[in-house]
Structures are given as C-alpha cells and as structure tokens.
Amino acid sequence: MKINGNEIRPGNVLMHQDTLWVAVKTDHVKPGKGGAFAQVELKNLLDGRKLNERFRAADKVEKVRLEQKDYTFLFASDDMLTFMDAETYEQIELQTDFVGEERASYLTDGMTVVVESHEERPIGISLPQHVTLEVADTEPVVKGQTAANSYKPAILSNGVRSSVPPFVGVGEKIIVATEDGSYVKRAD
C-alpha cells in the first residue's frame, strides 16, 4: 500500500531502495521557505543498518504489512533454533544470530513467540515481555543493609546476569523482562 511521505509513523515497515526498513523516529519539519517534509530515521530489518532519509509530502512510499504468526520454541542445537507453527505443526529453523545471542538465552521449551515474516521469509521475532527464571547464584544478604534502592548481582538459570533486590536468594524463581534482563518481581 502506497502512503505519502508525511504519513510515515514510527513502527511503520517500508519498502525503500528495494529493502525492508522500519521507521524508528520521525520529525515533521515545516521550514519557513520551501515545502514541508518528514525527516525519518530508518533501520534495516535484515542487517540493522540505520539511515536518515528525508521525504516530502508528495513522495510516495510503499508501506509493507508483515505477517505475524505464533510459533512454539522446540529446541536449540549448535547455532540453530527450531520452532513449530502452532497451527500447521510445520517446523522452521532460525540461526541464533538471527534472534540474537542474549535474546536466545531467554527461550525455553514450549515458549510461544511471534515470528514476523514478509513473503514467507522470517525477518523478526518477538519474545514474551516477561519470563520466569530461577536464581542460580547471588550474594548472601548483608544484615543492616537498608538502602532503599540497593540491588545485588545475580546469575540466572539461563546464564544471564541481572540485578535483584536483597531479599531474593538462590533457588528462588523471579520474573525478568526479556528486553533488558531487569528484575520485575518474584514469581508466585
């Protein structure tokens, strides 16, 4: 679907220069002299490159709609991750680099993820916002340490390092944000 250059919004996926780009940031500029334009920061969906582009209101840009499908994570072997389509039971394999080394460490057997694809080709993956993990190692609580925002380092069951409150001990299950590995709360 073609849209005008001034209709580009952050999050839009565009076909520009024969490549898929996502609009990260848009600034609409109305100079005193000349026509209005949109200054758009684009990120390449395939290799992560960034590009700043200027679109006039009259410019036409191809807006792409990505297919989003639920997949279940099955297992990891070497540098490949195997997922199964929840509806057709068809399996796909993606390289760990495609997902990202740190993000791949949050994947657990049976976890549901959303795979975004364009023309049957996977181009992105969305993990759940939060996952439940066990604290594998952390420092013991120091009595009398009552600072309001004191966190201590911890290593989680998936090997990721995080900061947890002083009351969290080894073996406890906590909920962690997959975006940055930060502590959210204790698991029930």
Curated annotation (Swiss-Prot):
Involved in peptide bond synthesis. Stimulates efficient translation and peptide-bond synthesis on native or reconstituted 70S ribosomes in vitro. Probably functions indirectly by altering the affinity of the ribosome for aminoacyl-tRNA, thus increasing their reactivity as acceptors for peptidyl transferase. The keyword Protein biosynthesis applies. This is Elongation factor P. Its main location: cytoplasm. Belongs to the elongation factor P family. GO terms for cellular component: cytoplasm. The lineage of its organism: Bacteria, Pseudomonadati, Pseudomonadota, Alphaproteobacteria, Maricaulales. Pathway: Protein biosynthesis; polypeptide chain elongation. SMART domains: EFP (SM01185), Elong-fact-P_C (SM00841). Transmembrane segments: none annotated. Signal peptide: none annotated. InterPro entries: Elong-fact-P_C, NA-bd_OB-fold, Rib_uL2_dom2, Transl_elong_fac_P/YeiP, Transl_elong_KOW-like, Transl_elong_P/YeiP_cen, Transl_elongation_fac_P, Translation_prot_SH3-like_sf. Coiled coil: none annotated. One of its GO terms (molecular function) is translation elongation factor activity. Keywords: Cytoplasm, Elongation factor, Protein biosynthesis. One of its GO terms (biological process) is peptide biosynthetic process. It is found in: Cytoplasm.
